[in-house]
């Protein structure tokens, strides 16, 4: 029997729409509850330092109302770690962050920033958080994740999602497969995400070593036309179909 693949729904872009007009709606808290009701295994949200979408209020309320779990993405900065200490998220994912980027552009470079990342991992673990590191599918970065004490990694799938040819997409898929296998051999829990949508998720979902996919933009975009609950259910269905064809 194949291990179930979990779905974490990222609700950042519900907040993006709200912040565009400075209104109280649409409310990410309601979105989190609806996604959870539709079958999401967890809710992911990225509170950026510039507060362009998710606000502190959102994080506090979502943590209170969720029946599943909250995965808080945050930069490795003193301000964000102080906030995490206040919230004590069940799961925290350290991500790179640049103010000028539209979305996260790559994985965390643990090799370059090892001391800072290691201190952040320890601090979060002392809060009781399970820590993951958002990294590129690179063996050296995976080894570094083990070295700094992170039990979980999330593989950046952006290069796969952005590939403009079948050859390039196949190459990036193989990179992710090999990285997932390598990480699993080191006893890491392996998640993945970034840029995944309804037309490219199945090959990723079929990777047996993956534990969870975090998907946001595609689900929120689909929700405009069919509603959030249906969008979540459809993504889950595609992921489950992909797992049916994975050999034990």
UniProtKB/Swiss-Prot annotation:
Protein EC? 2.6.99.2
Question: What is the protein's quaternary organization?
Answer: Homooctamer; tetramer of dimers.
**Major localization class:** cytoplasm
Matches recorded under Gene3D superfamilies: Aldolase class I
Annotated localization: Cytoplasm
Q: Which GO terms describe its molecular function?
A: pyridoxine 5'-phosphate synthase activity
Extract the HAMAP family matched here: PdxJ (MF_00279)
Pathway assigned in UniProt: Cofactor biosynthesis; pyridoxine 5'-phosphate biosynthesis; pyridoxine 5'-phosphate from D-erythrose 4-phosphate: step 5/5
Q: Where does 1-deoxy-D-xylulose 5-phosphate bind?
A: 12-13, 48, 53, 103
Site residues (Transition state stabilizer), renumbered to this chain: 154
In which residues is 3-amino-2-oxopropyl phosphate bound? 10, 21, 195, 216-217
Tell me which species this is from: Legionella pneumophila subsp. pneumophila (strain Philadelphia 1 / ATCC 33152 / DSM 7513)
Q: Which GO terms describe its biological process?
A: pyridoxine biosynthetic process
What protein am I looking at? Pyridoxine 5'-phosphate synthase
Q: Which family does it belong to?
A: Belongs to the PNP synthase family.
Q: What does it catalyze?
A: 3-amino-2-oxopropyl phosphate + 1-deoxy-D-xylulose 5-phosphate = pyridoxine 5'-phosphate + phosphate + 2 H2O + H(+)
The enzyme's main class, written as a single word, is transferase
Q: Which gene encodes it?
A: pdxJ
Q: Which InterPro entries match?
A: Aldolase_TIM (IPR013785), PyrdxlP_synth_PdxJ (IPR004569), Pyridoxine-5'_phos_synth (IPR036130)
- Pfam families from the UniProt entry: PdxJ
Key words of the record: Cytoplasm, Pyridoxine biosynthesis, Transferase
Give the function comment from the record: Catalyzes the complicated ring closure reaction between the two acyclic compounds 1-deoxy-D-xylulose-5-phosphate (DXP) and 3-amino-2-oxopropyl phosphate (1-amino-acetone-3-phosphate or AAP) to form pyridoxine 5'-phosphate (PNP) and inorganic phosphate.
GO cellular component term of the entry, any: cytosol
């Amino acid at each position: 029997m194949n291990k179930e693949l979990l779905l974490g729904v990222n609700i950042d872009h519900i907040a993006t729409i709200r912040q565009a007009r400075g209104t109280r709606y649409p409310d990410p808290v309601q979105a989190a509850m609806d996604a959870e009701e539709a079958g999401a295994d967890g809710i992911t949200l990225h509170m950026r330092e510039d507060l362009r979408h998710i606000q502190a209020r959102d994080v506090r309320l979502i943590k209170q109302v969720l029946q599943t779990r909250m995965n808080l993405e945050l930069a490795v900065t003193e301000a964000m770690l102080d906030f995490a200490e206040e919230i004590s998220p069940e799961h925290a994912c350290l991500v790179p962050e640049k103010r000028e980027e539209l979305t996260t552009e790559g994985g965390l470079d643990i090799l370059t920033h090892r001391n800072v990342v290691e201190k952040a991992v320890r601090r979060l673990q002392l809060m009781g958080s399970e820590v993951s590191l958002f990294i590129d599918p690179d063996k050296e970065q995976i080894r570094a994740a083990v070295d700094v004490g992170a039990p979980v990694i999330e593989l950046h799938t952006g290069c796969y999602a952005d590939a403009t040819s079948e050859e390039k997409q196949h190459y990036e898929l193989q990179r992710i497969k090999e990285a997932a296998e390598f990480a699993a051999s080191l006893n890491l829990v392996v998640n993945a995400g970034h840029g995944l949508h309804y037309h490219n998720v199945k090959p990723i979902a079929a990777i047996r070593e993956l534990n969870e996919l975090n998907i946001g933009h595609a689900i929120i975009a689909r929700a405009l036309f069919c509603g959030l609950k249906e969008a979540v259910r459809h993504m889950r269905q595609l992921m489950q179909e992909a797992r049916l064809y994975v050999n034990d």
